[in-house]
């Protein structure tokens, strides 16, 4: 059995993140999106889940409401989404994709599918299940740590 140094795992996770950002950054810029602001996730989630409130979308995309608001403004200006009064709560809006937004979201979905295939191509089912379980554990550890250190401004953004 090979003994893996813990620091090597951290380094590999960091490298994976860097390459992931580079790959997705290029892919999404090619179709006219800004990936660092969550635009692809917003479009994909609206395509998959349909119209929803800004807060529900922010929670689903794991974005604070300030970032979400600015990003929605940009996507609306680009003609990719619209905001309409929410009939069940007059103080909020329902965010939905326009026809152009659906087309762009389909492009995003294809990019994600290609990435999924690239991630899974080098592993069999058992390895994928083991990787999934391990990544869930790592995510859980970081999630717990993040909850302990969340800044007051983070909570303020989530309450809206």
Write out the residue ranges for each language-model feature.
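N-terminal leader segment of winged-helix/HTH proteins
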Residues: 1-33
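C-terminal regulatory/oligomerization modules of transcriptional regulators
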Residues: 1-4, 126-160
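Short, locally clustered residues in the helix-turn-helix/winged-helix DNA-binding domain
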Residues: 17, 44-48, 109
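Pre-recognition alpha-helix immediately N-terminal to the DNA-recognition helix
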Residues: 23, 41-44, 103, 107
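Short capping segments at the starts of secondary-structure elements
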Residues: 49-53
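Residues within helix-turn-helix
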Residues: 54-55, 66, 73, 93
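The alpha-helix within a helix-turn-helix
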Residues: 58
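Charged, amphipathic alpha-helical coiled-coil/dimerization segments
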Residues: 73-143
């Amino acid at each position: 059995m090979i003994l893996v140094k813990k620091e090597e795992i951290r380094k590999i996770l960091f490298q994976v993140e860097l390459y992931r950002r580079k790959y997705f950054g290029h892919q999404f810029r090619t179709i006219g999106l800004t990936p660092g602001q969550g635009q692809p996730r917003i479009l994909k989630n609206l395509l998959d889940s349909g119209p929803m409130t800004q807060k529900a979308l922010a929670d689903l995309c794991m974005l604070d409401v300030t970032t979400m608001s600015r990003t929605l403004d940009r996507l609306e200006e680009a003609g990719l989404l619209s905001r309409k009064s929410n009939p069940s709560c007059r103080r909020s809006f329902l965010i939905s994709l326009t026809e152009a937004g659906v087309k762009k979201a389909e492009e995003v979905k294809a990019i994600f599918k290609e990435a999924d295939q690239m991630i899974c191509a080098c592993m069999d089912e058992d390895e994928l299940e083991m990787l999934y379980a391990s990544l869930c554990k790592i995510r859980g550890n970081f999630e717990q740590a993040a909850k302990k250190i969340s800044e007051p401004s983070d909570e303020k953004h989530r309450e809206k």
